[in-house]
């Protein structure tokens, strides 16, 4: 730290000392890749505000690298696998998920996805067990008296830590497959009549056939698909706590859910007071580019630049795919900045420059950038929205197809399927996005929506974490639906009671009418006699 930074940090600590409750202790259960990139931004902001932040890091962590210079504390715990083991697993899952997924039937695709999630669940459970069974570390954590736990909901264990340490819990989440966690643990009402099931790749304007498809997928996710091995996790949690419980029940105790999206990307749907959108919290104004890159961008003249990146998890393309992409890029008048780590394609044009890493946000914010060719990861999508850049989407896995389809529905993107990627198809998509002004106009419209918020997403995320610390939880924001059984939630008991009342009234009226009829008939007979 510089002298100036040290002085500011000491000043904050003094403020915390004289204002008890102004600063607190935050324990973090993170996950890898873009999830860590997002949550790290929140942690840095919390640390700058004087909070003591502690991150739990496994010895096999891929991106989370503890540094002495950081204002964040790191607690490293040993796990029975190495960093290379974890990297291999992620690479294998990505390969299995992306291999020809567009050509598979929807049920075969979901079957493959379930297999990937089962294996992922096993790995995360092993990481969690290594932490929970580390008695010395758990004793240290219990003695630290944390004010809040911040956890990524796609990696279970944060809810168990919150229960063991008797600490409020805040989730950071993009989504669970089929909205399973949000619905069953968070209690979020998501009617399938107009809310497309996440991963369904549908929009909110569905035809009858699409609503049938949406309903079937909702039933599949609700009653069959499991993002985590529910039975295994529930048994583990029950053994640790010494009482019967379930993963769904434990996750349902979260105080606040910070969802990494916003109404610029998301379709309208019901919300609850303990949910809030913080999509794009990592976005910021563009900084100057490195000198060499700036010179290349400026050399594009009036044609401008296209930015190409398939994210951090996809290291390179096959040689065949790389040549297909390079051939298409070589035929456009724009200069191209391509994030690529592999053998130089034979068809690479003179207008294209390869980089192992690019300052993506700064490039997207450059006035000469005309389009963004991307895989559709949420971070990249939000950087494009922030700067108002139209997208050519080549989705690969996870939330990417859904994200790209949302942008297509909003008129700010064109989708190209990876499995049938061709030079002609990519070239056509690029020309459409850059030559049709409606794509730029729609991208700018989404950008205006994103910027028109009373509080910035990052400040909102920090506010809710501090809110939970100040109030020692936020149970007053949780709906009482968590205390209802499924038949009470759907009012089946009330409907049954009312139906019984109606049947009873009809029965009594019928009996009364029959009685009156018989009475009248008997009186008639007596008069005749």
Swiss-Prot record:
It comes from Rattus norvegicus. GO terms for molecular function: glucuronosyltransferase activity. UDP-glucuronosyltransferase (UGT) that catalyzes phase II biotransformation reactions in which lipophilic substrates are conjugated with glucuronic acid to increase the metabolite's water solubility, thereby facilitating excretion into either the urine or bile. Essential for the elimination and detoxification of drugs, xenobiotics and endogenous compounds. Catalyzes the glucuronidation of the endogenous estrogen hormone estradiol. Belongs to the UDP-glycosyltransferase family. Keywords: Endoplasmic reticulum, Glycoprotein, Glycosyltransferase, Membrane, Signal, Transferase, Transmembrane, Transmembrane helix. The chain crosses the membrane at residues 494-510. It catalyses: glucuronate acceptor + UDP-alpha-D-glucuronate = acceptor beta-D-glucuronoside + UDP + H(+); 17beta-estradiol + UDP-alpha-D-glucuronate = 17beta-estradiol 17-O-(beta-D-glucuronate) + UDP + H(+). It holds the Pfam family UDPGT. The lineage of its organism: Eukaryota, Metazoa, Chordata, Craniata, Vertebrata. This is UDP-glucuronosyltransferase 2B1. It is found in: Endoplasmic reticulum membrane. Induction: By phenobarbital.
């Amino acid at each position: 730290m510089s002298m100036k930074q040290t002085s500011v940090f000491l000043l904050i600590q003094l403020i915390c000392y004289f204002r008890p409750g102004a600063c607190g202790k935050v324990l973090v259960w993170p996950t890898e890749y873009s999830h860590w990139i997002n949550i790290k931004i929140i942690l840095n902001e919390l640390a700058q505000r004087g909070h003591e932040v502690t991150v739990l890091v496994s010895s096999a962590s891929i991106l989370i690298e503890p540094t002495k210079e950081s204002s964040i504390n790191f607690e490293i715990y040993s796990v029975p696998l190495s960093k290379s083991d974890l990297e291999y697993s992620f690479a294998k899952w990505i390969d299995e998920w992306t291999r020809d997924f567009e050509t598979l039937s929807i049920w075969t695709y979901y079957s493959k996805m379930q297999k990937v999630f089962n294996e992922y669940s096993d790995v995360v459970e092993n990481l969690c067990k290594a932490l929970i069974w580390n008695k010395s570390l758990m004793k240290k954590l219990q003695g630290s008296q944390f004010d809040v736990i911040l956890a990524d909901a796609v990696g279970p264990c944060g809810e168990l830590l919150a229960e063991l340490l008797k600490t409020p819990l805040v989730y950071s989440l993009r989504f669970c497959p089929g909205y399973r966690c949000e619905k069953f643990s968070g209690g979020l009402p998501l009617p399938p009549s107009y809310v497309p099931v996440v991963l369904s790749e549908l929009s909110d304007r569905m035809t009858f056939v699409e609503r049938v498809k949406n309903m079937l997928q909702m039933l599949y996710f609700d009653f069959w698909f499991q993002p985590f091995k529910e039975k295994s996790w529930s048994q583990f949690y029950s053994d640790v706590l010494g009482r019967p419980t379930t993963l769904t029940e434990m996750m349902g105790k979260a105080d606040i859910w910070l969802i990494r999206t916003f109404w610029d990307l998301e379709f309208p749907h019901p919300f609850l007071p303990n949910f809030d959108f913080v999509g794009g919290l990592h976005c910021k104004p563009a900084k100057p580019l490195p000198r060499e890159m700036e010179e290349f961008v400026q050399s594009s003249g009036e044609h401008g630049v296209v930015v190409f990146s398939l994210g951090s998890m996809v290291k390179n393309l096959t040689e065949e795919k790389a040549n297909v992409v390079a051939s298409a890029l070589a035929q456009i008048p724009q200069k191209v900045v391509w994030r690529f780590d592999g053998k130089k394609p034979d068809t690479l044009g003179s207008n294209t420059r390869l980089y192992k890493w690019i300052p993506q946000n700064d490039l997207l914010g450059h006035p000469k950038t005309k389009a963004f060719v991307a895989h559709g990861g949420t971070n990249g999508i939000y950087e494009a929205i922030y700067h108002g850049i139209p997208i050519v989407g080549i989705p690969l896995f996870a939330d990417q197809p859904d994200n790209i389809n949302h942008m297509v529905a909003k008129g700010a993107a064109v989708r190209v399927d990876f499995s049938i990627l061709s030079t002609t198809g990519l070239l056509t998509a690029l020309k459409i996005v850059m030559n049709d002004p409606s794509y730029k106009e729609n991208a700018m419209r989404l950008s205006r929506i994103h910027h028109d918020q009373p509080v910035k997403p990052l400040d909102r995320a920090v506010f809710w974490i501090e809110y939970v610390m100040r109030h020692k939880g936020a149970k007053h924001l949780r709906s009482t639906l968590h205390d209802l059984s499924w038949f009470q939630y759907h009012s089946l008991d009330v409907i049954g009671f009312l139906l019984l009342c109606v049947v009873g009234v009809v029965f009594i009226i019928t009996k009364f009418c029959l009685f009156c009829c018989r009475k009248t008939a008997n009186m008639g007979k007596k008069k005749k006699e």
